Regions:
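Cytosolic-side membrane-insertion boundary helix
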Residues: 126-161, 174-180, 217-220
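Alpha-helical transmembrane segments of integral membrane proteins
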Residues: 158-231
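Soluble extramembrane regions of membrane proteins in the secretory/endomembrane system
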Residues: 1-145
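C-terminal domain-closing interface element
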Residues: 8-25, 152-172
């Protein structure tokens, strides 16, 4: 209702928590985020994947960041997700918030703020205007980012590699190709099944409710998550 409070605002860093521990994930951006991510690259310890903003744009529910998006502001949204069982409960309080999570918030936000206030280019009100989204992910402490055109080239190279492998393996007819695809699909299903079974077993051992995308306080949850996303 009081939109004038946004006058002069050029970039928003929204910090929220949907849990009490774990890495601080940059999980949402404004649309056409190429220029927005130029500034995010200033962070010391990035943690983000381009699939998460795409997912949140499809969900009917909003976040604390939604009000800024509705007012056409650019920026990012950062949150922790582990310890979700504490969310909106009496345990959702500062005493239960992980010190490591707080540090990770700071490791991302402080360098961004310093870059924003010290780099003259960010005084330009149009600096964050862009017409495209980026593909991005973190690998270790490195923030990997490239354009959607580059992504299409990479997908084309993968397709060519598959065709080369088919030729190299002398798979020359449809029957053999289908057999090859079927065999590898079976391997994939077996791997997924084993990962799923192991996940349920560990949840049972730890006395926790099993969630396919969320295993709070489960031992080896990182290994399980890697198995799931690889498949």
């Amino acid at each position: 209702k009081e939109k004038e409070i946004f006058d002069g605002v050029n970039y928003v860093i929204n910090i929220e928590a949907r849990g009490t521990s774990g890495p601080a994930i940059m999980f949402e951006t404004s649309p056409n985020n190429k220029a927005v991510l130029d500034l995010y690259e200033a962070t010391d310890k990035p943690y983000s994947y381009s699939i998460t903003p795409e997912i949140y744009r499809l969900l009917p529910n909003g976040t604390d960041f939604t009000v800024f998006l509705e007012n056409n502001l650019t920026g990012i949204n950062i949150s922790v997700l582990d310890g979700f069982e504490n969310y909106h409960t009496p345990n959702d309080n500062p005493d239960n918030l992980s010190d490591k999570s707080m540090q990770h918030y700071g490791d991302q936000v402080l360098p961004i703020v310093r870059e924003f206030v010290s780099n003259e280019k960010y005084s330009n009100p149009d600096v964050f205007e862009s017409k495209e989204d980026s593909i991005f992910f973190t690998l270790g402490n490195q923030f990997i980012r490239y354009s959607k055109n580059t992504n299409m080239v990479l997908l084309a190279l993968i397709a060519l590699s598959i065709l080369f492998a088919i030729k190299k393996l002398n798979i020359t007819n449809i029957k053999k190709i289908l057999k090859y695809i079927g065999r590898n699909s079976l391997y994939t299903l077996v791997t997924v099944g084993l990962g799923y079974g192991l996940s349920r077993l560990l949840a049972l051992i730890n006395g926790r409710k099993f969630e396919i995308t969320y295993l709070p306080l489960i031992k080896f949850e990182d290994v399980i998550f890697i198995i799931v996303i690889q498949e």
